[in-house]
C-alpha cells in the first residue's frame, strides 16, 4: 500500500519532518514531481539535513529512494546534495538512490533563461526560485527537453543540448552561458550517473505488493500548475494527481493521503495571499518561526491560518489525515485568528472554494474568527493531553473546520521527536 504526503498550502509546511518520521518504516520513498526548487529541512540526532531534489527518506538507513519520472533533475545539485549528506554521516546514501530515465534534465541554461524571463515580466514577475524549473518544464511540454536517460547517449545528448541553446539564443540573443562548457561537464557526469539511472516501471513493479511505499510531495497544492494561484505557481503538478502520474501509482493501492498544514500560513514569492499580515503579527510569525526559504534564503510572507484555502486543498487532494506543524510558534500570541470565509467584491461569500482569478483574490475581504491564545510553552511536547486547553481547542477547531479529517500528528518543534501522535 502507498502513503502520500502532500503540502496543503503554499509550501514550507514541514513535509520533510513527517516524511522522515514515516520513512523509518518505509521500504521505498519517492519524489514524484518538481526539482531542486523544493526545500525540506530535517533534524535528526541533532544533525540538520537540507533536502532539495533528493527524497527525505535517505535519512532512514533501510529506505530505498527514487526520483521519479515527473521530476526535473539538476545533475550538479544532485551530486552536491549527495556529497553534503555523506559529510554529515550518511555515507551509504549514494547506494540507496535512483533516478528514473524518464525524468528531465534541468540545465544551467534553464536557470539563465529563468532570470531573463522574470526580468521581462518586471512588476508582474512570478517570484520563482531562479533554479530554471519553469523553462525546463516548458521544454518538456514542447517536446524538446532532454531526459536523464539520454545523458548516456553522448551523441543524442550533445545534439539536443546544442539545439536547446540555439533556440534560446534566437529568442534572447547572446546568453551568459557556455554550452560547450556544460557539455564537457557532462562527459564527467556520464559515467558517474550510470549506476543511478533506472527504468522506473520494472523498478516499481518489484514493490507492487509492498505495503510500505512512501511518496513525498514537493511544493504544495496552491502552487499546483492547474489548481494553484495561477500564474503565481510552479510548473508541475504538486497535488495528488501529480503523484499518481509521476510514479505510475495504482490508485487502488493508495492507503493514506496525508495533508501537511502549518498552524499559520506562509508564502514565498509573488502572488495573492488573503490572510497575509503586513504588521507586527506577520513579523512575529516570521521571526519566531524562522521563516526563511531553505532553497533561496528569502523571507517568507506570513499570515493567519486560512480554513477556506485548506478546505479547497482538501477537496482537490482528498486527505485521509492531517499533520499540523509548528504549533509551538503560536505559543506567545494573546489571540489567534483563523480565516473562515471570503467575501468577493460582488458580495458573494465563499467558505470552501477558491477563485481562479488572482486579481479577484487580491480584492476579496477575509472573514475571521478570533480564538484565545495559550501563552505557554508547547515546544517538545509529545502527548496531546499535555497541550494547554486553548491549544487543544485550536487544533480541534481546525479539525472540525476541515470536515473532521483527523489531525493525527502535531509538530511541536523542529526535531523528529518533537511530535504528538493522536
Curated annotation (Swiss-Prot):
<dbReference type="InterPro" id="IPR042111">
    <property type="entry name" value="Adenylosuccinate_synth_dom3"/>
</dbReference>
<feature type="binding site">
    <location>
        <begin position="294"/>
        <end position="300"/>
    </location>
    <ligand>
        <name>substrate</name>
    </ligand>
</feature>
<feature type="binding site" description="in other chain">
    <location>
        <begin position="12"/>
        <end position="15"/>
    </location>
    <ligand>
        <name>IMP</name>
    </ligand>
</feature>
<comment type="function">
    <text>Plays an important role in the de novo pathway and in the salvage pathway of purine nucleotide biosynthesis. Catalyzes the first committed step in the biosynthesis of AMP from IMP.</text>
</comment>
<feature type="binding site">
    <location>
        <begin position="11"/>
        <end position="17"/>
    </location>
    <ligand>
        <name>GTP</name>
    </ligand>
</feature>
<dbReference type="GO" id="GO:0004019">
    <property type="term" value="F:adenylosuccinate synthase activity"/>
</dbReference>
<keyword id="KW-0342">GTP-binding</keyword>
<feature type="binding site">
    <location>
        <position position="12"/>
    </location>
    <ligand>
        <name>Mg(2+)</name>
    </ligand>
</feature>
<comment type="pathway">
    <text>Purine metabolism; AMP biosynthesis via de novo pathway; AMP from IMP: step 1/2.</text>
</comment>
<feature type="binding site" description="in other chain">
    <location>
        <position position="298"/>
    </location>
    <ligand>
        <name>IMP</name>
    </ligand>
</feature>
<dbReference type="InterPro" id="IPR042110">
    <property type="entry name" value="Adenylosuccinate_synth_dom2"/>
</dbReference>
<feature type="binding site" description="in other chain">
    <location>
        <position position="129"/>
    </location>
    <ligand>
        <name>IMP</name>
    </ligand>
</feature>
<dbReference type="InterPro" id="IPR027417">
    <property type="entry name" value="P-loop_NTPase"/>
</dbReference>
<keyword id="KW-0547">Nucleotide-binding</keyword>
<feature type="binding site">
    <location>
        <position position="143"/>
    </location>
    <ligand>
        <name>IMP</name>
    </ligand>
</feature>
<dbReference type="InterPro" id="IPR018220">
    <property type="entry name" value="Adenylosuccin_syn_GTP-bd"/>
</dbReference>
<keyword id="KW-0963">Cytoplasm</keyword>
<keyword id="KW-0479">Metal-binding</keyword>
<comment type="subunit">
    <text>Homodimer.</text>
</comment>
<feature type="binding site">
    <location>
        <position position="300"/>
    </location>
    <ligand>
        <name>GTP</name>
    </ligand>
</feature>
<dbReference type="Pfam" id="PF00709">
    <property type="entry name" value="Adenylsucc_synt"/>
</dbReference>
<comment type="similarity">
    <text>Belongs to the adenylosuccinate synthetase family.</text>
</comment>
<feature type="binding site">
    <location>
        <begin position="326"/>
        <end position="328"/>
    </location>
    <ligand>
        <name>GTP</name>
    </ligand>
</feature>
<feature type="binding site" description="in other chain">
    <location>
        <position position="219"/>
    </location>
    <ligand>
        <name>IMP</name>
    </ligand>
</feature>
<feature type="binding site">
    <location>
        <begin position="411"/>
        <end position="413"/>
    </location>
    <ligand>
        <name>GTP</name>
    </ligand>
</feature>
<feature type="binding site" description="in other chain">
    <location>
        <begin position="37"/>
        <end position="40"/>
    </location>
    <ligand>
        <name>IMP</name>
    </ligand>
</feature>
<dbReference type="GO" id="GO:0044208">
    <property type="term" value="P:'de novo' AMP biosynthetic process"/>
</dbReference>
<dbReference type="GO" id="GO:0005737">
    <property type="term" value="C:cytoplasm"/>
</dbReference>
<feature type="active site" description="Proton acceptor">
    <location>
        <position position="12"/>
    </location>
</feature>
<feature type="binding site" description="in other chain">
    <location>
        <position position="234"/>
    </location>
    <ligand>
        <name>IMP</name>
    </ligand>
</feature>
<feature type="active site" description="Proton donor">
    <location>
        <position position="40"/>
    </location>
</feature>
<keyword id="KW-0436">Ligase</keyword>
<protein>
    <recommendedName>
        <fullName>Adenylosuccinate synthetase</fullName>
        <ecNumber>6.3.4.4</ecNumber>
    </recommendedName>
</protein>
<feature type="binding site">
    <location>
        <begin position="39"/>
        <end position="41"/>
    </location>
    <ligand>
        <name>GTP</name>
    </ligand>
</feature>
<dbReference type="GO" id="GO:0046040">
    <property type="term" value="P:IMP metabolic process"/>
</dbReference>
<dbReference type="GO" id="GO:0005525">
    <property type="term" value="F:GTP binding"/>
</dbReference>
<dbReference type="InterPro" id="IPR033128">
    <property type="entry name" value="Adenylosuccin_syn_Lys_AS"/>
</dbReference>
<feature type="binding site">
    <location>
        <position position="39"/>
    </location>
    <ligand>
        <name>Mg(2+)</name>
    </ligand>
</feature>
<keyword id="KW-0460">Magnesium</keyword>
<dbReference type="GO" id="GO:0000287">
    <property type="term" value="F:magnesium ion binding"/>
</dbReference>
<dbReference type="InterPro" id="IPR001114">
    <property type="entry name" value="Adenylosuccinate_synthetase"/>
</dbReference>
<keyword id="KW-0658">Purine biosynthesis</keyword>
Amino acid at each position: 500500500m502507498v502513503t502520500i504526503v502532500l503540502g496543503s498550502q503554499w509550501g514550507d509546511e514541514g513535509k520533510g519532518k513527517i516524511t522522515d518520521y514515516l520513512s523509518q518504516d518505509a521500504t521505498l520513498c519517492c519524489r514524484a514531481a518538481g526539482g531542486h526548487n523544493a526545500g525540506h529541512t530535517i533534524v535528526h540526532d541533532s544533525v540538520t539535513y537540507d533536502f532539495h531534489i533528493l527524497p527525505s527518506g535517505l535519512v532512514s538507513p533501510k529506505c530505498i529512494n527514487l526520483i521519479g519520472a515527473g521530476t526535473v533533475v539538476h545533475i550538479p545539485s544532485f551530486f552536491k546534495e549527495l556529497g553534503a549528506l555523506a559529510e554529515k554521516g550518511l555515507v551509504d546514501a549514494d547506494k540507496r538512490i535512483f533516478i528514473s530515465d524518464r525524468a528531465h534534465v534541468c540545465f544551467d541554461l534553464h536557470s539563465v533563461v529563468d532570470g531573463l524571463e522574470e526580468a521581462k515580466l518586471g512588476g508582474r514577475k512570478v517570484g520563482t526560485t531562479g533554479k530554471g524549473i519553469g523553462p525546463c518544464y516548458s521544454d518538456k511540454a514542447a517536446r524538446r527537453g532532454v531526459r536523464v536517460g539520454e545523458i548516456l547517449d553522448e551523441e543524442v545528448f550533445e545534439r539536443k543540448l546544442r539545439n536547446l541553446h540555439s533556440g534560446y539564443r534566437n529568442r534572447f540573443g547572446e546568453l551568459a552561458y557556455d554550452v560547450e562548457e556544460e557539455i564537457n561537464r557532462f562527459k564527467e557526469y556520464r559515467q558517474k550517473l550510470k549506476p543511478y539511472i533506472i527504468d522506473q516501471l520494472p523498478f516499481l513493479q518489484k514493490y507492487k505488493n509492498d505495503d510500505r511505499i512512501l511518496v513525498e510531495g514537493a511544493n504544495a497544492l496552491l502552487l499546483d500548475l492547474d489548481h494553484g494561484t495561477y500564474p503565481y505557481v510552479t510548473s508541475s503538478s504538486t497535488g495528488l494527481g501529480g503523484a499518481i502520474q509521476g510514479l505510475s501509482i495504482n490508485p487502488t493501492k493508495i492507503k493514506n493521503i496525508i495533508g501537511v498544514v502549518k498552524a499559520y500560513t506562509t508564502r514565498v514569492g509573488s502572488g495573492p495571499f488573503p490572510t497575509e499580515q503586513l504588521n507586527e503579527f506577520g513579523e512575529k510569525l516570521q521571526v519566531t518561526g524562522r521563516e526563511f526559504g531553505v532553497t533561496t534564503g528569502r523571507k517568507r510572507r506570513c499570515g493567519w491560518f486560512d480554513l477556506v484555502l485548506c478546505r479547497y486543498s482538501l477537496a482537490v487532494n482528498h486527505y485521509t489525515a492531517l499533520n499540523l506543524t509548528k504549533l509551538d510558534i503560536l505559543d506567545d500570541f494573546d489571540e489567534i485568528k483563523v480565516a473562515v470565509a471570503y467575501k468577493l467584491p460582488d458580495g458573494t461569500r465563499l467558505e470552501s472554494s477558491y477563485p481562479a482569478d488572482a486579481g479577484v483574490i487580491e480584492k476579496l475581504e477575509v472573514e475571521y474568527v478570533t480564538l484565545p491564545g495559550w501563552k505557554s510553552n508547547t515546544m517538545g511536547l509529545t502527548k496531546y493531553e499535555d497541550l494547554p486547553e486553548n491549544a487543544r481547542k485550536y487544533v480541534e477547531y481546525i479539525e472540525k473546520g476541515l470536515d473532521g479529517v483527523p489531525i493525527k500528528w502535531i509538530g511541536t518543534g523542529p526535531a523528529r521527536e518533537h511530535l504528538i501522535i493522536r
